[in-house]
């Protein structure tokens, strides 16, 4: 009964398929595995026995009768946004897509309810089904936006494969627990599941491990089987902490079908303290503008250390390796100009936020670090609020004869009385990056008030106030 029941459990949810850039694909995608590995993007291959011949042959489009392969990677919606920690697996998918293969980004609308224990020292905080559904919807939008930017801004003239977004809730939400355990559970051995490093480390921890977390690798293995059956997916991509889960999927599929599938891992990106970049570690840099602005994302990469930037250029960009070598030669000559970091930041910001987001990040950089009046004049309200997140925002009417001290007081930027007056005369106040020392100076449009109807008031070294003038 097991095989018929498994086929029944594997109904295809056609309504949740989203495709990007699917076209007829020409043969001849050379070095599909060699190029990303040379960039340091592919870390481990599983099983090792198949990586010398079977896996390269799978992706060799020059062979007669060869067809595009399908590769997938999972993204659990434990938060409402992707973050920098997700970028490498996404870039891995994009490299396969660029070589003419089809890729699937799988949102874990069901698996997120259990919580992946891989790489964690304690259990995740439980999420409600409603929260997970909302997060899954947000992740789908984020994945679609990144795929659209990739297709629009990084085309290389080759025909690409398709980019598909699925949600595993489509095949898990209607399954009955007893049926699932009866048909799927019998194919997993407890000794093997208990031997995984992710399980061992948690069992030895003071908190232990819940049954839900323990069962996570079974559901992920079933995801792989489902995609193998319905989309011909033979390769799973994941972070290096996912190898145990990938192995479970390989063993499950091989046991049921006798076919070989494969796993590829990408390196984990860590902070300077060695912590994995992610929201759980409290150091997430988000790929959602509402949580991390294009300027903040840009600056995150501009601030990378010299000893990391070449590696990051290879990992996070599509730039050819000879071009990266040239960038590094320029960087070594004048490291203070941060040529390599700026190119890295530009490429990543453009992929995540599009050309408009990159332009915004550069405007904000000029306005904040180079005191550019020209940049301030063309900044939108949103950009100013993103740049000066702690700034107070006021809307004021420009009355005839409005002075510097009037403006400061209406914006609640200085105290009343002599103390506030002295703050101006002693040089503690600037408007639009220009110091003002005469409290009675009348505001001048074009100097104190920019063309976009805004004024940036700075008190001391760190206190900013944004004023939007009405009825100009």
Curated annotation (Swiss-Prot):
Function: Catalyzes the attachment of tyrosine to tRNA(Tyr) in a two-step reaction: tyrosine is first activated by ATP to form Tyr-AMP and then transferred to the acceptor end of tRNA(Tyr).
Residues carrying N6-acetyllysine: 350, 362
Organism: Mus musculus (Mouse)
CDD domains: TyrRS_core (cd00805)
Residues engaged in binding L-tyrosine: 72, 116, 216, 220, 223, 242
Cellular component terms per the entry's GO annotation: mitochondrial matrix; mitochondrion; nuclear body
Pfam families according to UniProt: tRNA-synt_1b
Keywords from the named record: Acetylation, Aminoacyl-tRNA synthetase, ATP-binding, Ligase, Mitochondrion, Nucleotide-binding, Protein biosynthesis, Transit peptide
Gene that this sequence comes from: Yars2
First-level EC class: ligase
Residue window of motif 'HIGH' region: 77-86
A GO molecular-function annotation: tRNA binding
UniProt main location, coarse: mitochondrion
Coiled coil: none
Binding positions for ATP per the UniProt entry: 76, 269, 279
Superkingdom: Eukaryota
Reaction equation(s) it catalyzes: tRNA(Tyr) + L-tyrosine + ATP = L-tyrosyl-tRNA(Tyr) + AMP + diphosphate + H(+)
The protein, known as: Tyrosine--tRNA ligase, mitochondrial
Family according to the record: Belongs to the class-I aminoacyl-tRNA synthetase family.
Subunit structure, as described in the record: Homodimer.
EC number(s) given by UniProt: 6.1.1.1
Compartments (UniProt record): Mitochondrion matrix
Motif ('KMSKS' region): 276-280
InterPro entries named among the record's database cross-references: aa-tRNA-synth_I_CS (IPR001412), aa-tRNA-synth_Ic (IPR002305), Rossmann-like_a/b/a_fold (IPR014729), S4_RNA-bd_sf (IPR036986), Tyr-tRNA-ligase (IPR002307), Tyr-tRNA-ligase_bac-type (IPR024088)
GO terms, biological process: mitochondrial tyrosyl-tRNA aminoacylation
């Amino acid at each position: 009964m097991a095989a018929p029941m498994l086929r029944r459990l594997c109904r295809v949810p056609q309504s949740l398929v989203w495709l990007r850039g699917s076209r007829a694909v020409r043969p001849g995608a050379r070095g599909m595995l060699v190029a990303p590995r040379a960039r340091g993007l592919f870390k481990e291959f599983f099983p090792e026995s198949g990586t010398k011949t079977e896996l390269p042959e799978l992706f060799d489009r020059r062979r007669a009768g060869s067809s595009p392969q399908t590769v997938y990677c999972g993204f659990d919606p434990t938060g409402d946004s992707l973050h920098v920690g997700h970028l490498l697996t996404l870039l891995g998918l994009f490299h396969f897509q660029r070589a003419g293969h089809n890729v699937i980004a799988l949102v874990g609308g069901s698996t997120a309810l259990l919580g992946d224990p891989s790489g964690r020292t304690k259990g995740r905080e439980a999420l409600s089904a409603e929260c997970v559904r909302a997060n899954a919807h947000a992740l789908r939008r984020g994945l679609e936006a990144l795929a659209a930017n990739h297709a629009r801004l990084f085309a290389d003239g080759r025909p690409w494969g398709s980019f598909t977004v699925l949600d595993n809730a489509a095949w898990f939400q209607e399954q009955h627990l007893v049926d699932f355990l009866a048909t799927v559970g019998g194919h997993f051995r407890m000794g093997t599941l208990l031997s995984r490093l992710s399980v061992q480390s948690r069992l030895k921890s003071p908190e232990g491990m819940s049954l839900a977390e323990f069962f996570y690798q079974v559901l992920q293995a079933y995801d792989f089987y489902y995609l193998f059956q319905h989309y011909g997916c033979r390769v799973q991509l994941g972070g290096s902490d996912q190898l145990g889960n990938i192995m479970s999927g390989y063993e499950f599929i091989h046991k049921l079908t006798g076919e070989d599938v494969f796993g590829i891992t990408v390196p984990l990106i860590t902070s300077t303290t060695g912590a994995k970049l992610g929201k759980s570690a409290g150091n997430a840099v988000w790929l959602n503008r509402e949580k991390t602005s294009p300027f903040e994302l840009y600056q995150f990469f501009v601030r990378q250390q010299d000893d990391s930037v070449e590696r990051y250029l290879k990992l996070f960009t599509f730039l050819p390796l000879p071009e990266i070598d040239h960038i590094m030669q320029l960087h070594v000559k004048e490291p203070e100009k941060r040529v390599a970091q700026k190119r890295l930041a530009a490429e990543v910001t453009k992929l995540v936020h599009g050309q408009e987001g990159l332009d915004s990040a550069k405007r904000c950089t000029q306005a904040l670090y180079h005191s550019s009046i020209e940049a301030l004049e063309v900044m939108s309200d949103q950009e100013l609020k993103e740049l000066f997140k702690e700034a107070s925002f006021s809307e004021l009417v420009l009355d005839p004869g409005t002075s510097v001290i009037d403006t400061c007081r209406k914006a609640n930027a200085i105290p009343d009385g002599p103390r506030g007056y002295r703050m101006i005369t002693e040089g503690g106040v600037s408007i639009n990056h220009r110091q003002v020392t005469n409290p009675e100076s009348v505001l001048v449009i074009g100097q104190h008030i920019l063309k976009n109807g805004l004024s940036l008031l700075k008190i001391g070294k760190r206190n900013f106030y944004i004023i939007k003038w009405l009825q100009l």
